[in-house]
């Protein structure tokens, strides 16, 4: 699966979020342009950890440069933890036979009470649309499903419980066609994820 290349707007959003992430944070990164933009903006950070459901190509530069070293995590310190990988051959080759990377089942990785054990969890996700009541739709456009239900809710909950944790749902305000992604109410049939 090729990595989503961030747009200009997504890069600006990613830069804003990166400014809010402290050194020593433990990251959970969703999939898509904005999460990749956040990762690209973290190259000057230190001692980041990674405890995430989906591992993508976007983490490779931070792992290879040592920005992600997992040294300050409380859950499996020194080790990157994920449940699945979505990426290129480069990602899979990097992951092959690594002692500093553990793939766990999703029930273990996405347990909010395990997630919260790490300090400063930064849960960074995106959405299809949000509404003014705070509902988040991340996996459908109306009734049309575009992805499976993932661990966004688990990480938003665990991140909020984490000491010094922060959670982010980041979206451009409009679609490429100029339609608002922020609605009074979600599109009828839209699945509420968070």
Residue ranges with predicted function:
Residues 1-194:
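Conserved phosphate- and dinucleotide-binding cores of soluble alpha/beta proteins
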């Amino acid at each position: 699966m090729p990595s989503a290349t961030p747009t200009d707007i997504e890069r600006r959003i990613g830069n804003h979020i990166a400014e809010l992430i402290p050194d020593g944070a433990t990251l959970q990164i969703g999939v898509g342009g904005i999460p990749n933009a956040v990762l690209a903006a973290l190259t000057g950070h230190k001692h980041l950890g990674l405890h995430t459901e989906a591992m993508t190509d976007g983490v490779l530069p931070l792992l290879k440069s040592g920005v992600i070293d997992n040294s300050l995590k409380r859950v499996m310190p020194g080790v990157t933890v994920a449940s699945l990988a979505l990426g290129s051959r480069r990602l899979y080759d990097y992951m092959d036979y690594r002692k500093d990377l553990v793939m766990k089942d999703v029930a273990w990785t996405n347990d909010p009470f395990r997630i919260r054990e790490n300090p400063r969890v930064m849960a960074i996700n995106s959405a299809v649309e949000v509404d003014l009541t705070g509902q988040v739709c991340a996996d459908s456009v109306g009734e049309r499903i575009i992805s499976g239900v993932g661990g966004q809710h688990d990480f938003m909950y665990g991140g909020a419980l984490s000491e010094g944790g922060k959670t982010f749902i980041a979206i451009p305000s409009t679609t490429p066609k100029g339609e608002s992604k922020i609605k009074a109410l979600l599109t009828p049939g839209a699945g509420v994820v968070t």
